[in-house]
């Protein structure tokens, strides 16, 4: 899962740091509630994954529920940011399911526990092509959670790094 906040243009860096820190709290809390793992903060986005180090049979469902809660729960904070700074922030979430390698990567100076693989890359592409205020999932995730949620088929989406369009 990738969840990102779209930065408005011409935002003061100090104000943006305060805004994004508040937003991160809203992005991270549902991940932990559904027992996901926060892998990293990436500027204005988070990378989280479900299924490691603790796996659940319903990890794809947990990821989707966390994504939906992120979009829902950011709304009051968006209003607060609009009132305080006059800035509209938007959140979008991308989710994909697939095989990844999970473990510690880095060097003697810095190590992080993360997930690597094409499934993570596709989640990032889902986030980058999602409409603001939405959760966009891949067809792989859709197959795993289809009877549990209502979906809108967005058709085929061109994504960076893929030779063929991806169904979203």
Per-region residue spans from a language model:
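Regulatory/sensor and coupling segments of signal-transduction and defense proteins
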Residues: 1-4, 104, 162
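Catalytic NTP-binding/metal-coordinating core of nucleotidyl cyclase/transferase enzymes
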Residues: 1-69, 73, 113
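A short glycine-enriched loop-to-beta-strand structural element that forms part of the catalytic core
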Residues: 44, 48-49, 87-103
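Cytosolic regulatory/linker segments at or just downstream of nucleotide-handling modules
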Residues: 100-102, 123, 129-168
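Conserved, well-folded catalytic cores of nucleic-acid-processing
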Residues: 56, 70-73, 77-80, 84, ...
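Catalytic-core segments of nucleotide cyclases and related cyclic-nucleotide turnover enzymes
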Residues: 57, 64, 92, 96, ...
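Catalytic core regions of nucleotide second-messenger enzymes
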Residues: 32-42, 73-94, 156-159, 163
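Residues immediately flanking
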Residues: 1, 52, 97, 139-140
């Amino acid at each position: 899962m990738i969840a990102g906040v779209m930065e408005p243009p011409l935002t003061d860096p100090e104000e943006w740091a305060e805004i994004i820190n508040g937003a991160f709290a809203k992005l991270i809390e549902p991940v932990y509630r559904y027992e996901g793992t926060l892998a990293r903060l990436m500027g204005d986005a988070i990378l989280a994954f479900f299924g490691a180090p603790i796996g659940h049979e319903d990890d794809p469902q947990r990821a989707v529920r966390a994504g939906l809660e992120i979009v829902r729960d950011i709304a009051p904070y968006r209003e607060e940011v609009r009132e305080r700074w006059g800035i509209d922030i938007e959140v979008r979430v991308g989710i994909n399911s697939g095989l990844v390698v999970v473990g510690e990567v880095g060097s003697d100076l810095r190590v992080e526990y993360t997930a690597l693989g094409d499934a993570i890359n596709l989640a990032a592409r889902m986030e980058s092509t999602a409409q603001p205020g939405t959760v966009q999932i891949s067809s792989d995730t859709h197959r795993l959670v289809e009877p549990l949620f209502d979906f809108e088929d967005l058709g085929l989406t061109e994504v960076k790094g893929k030779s063929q369009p991806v169904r979203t």
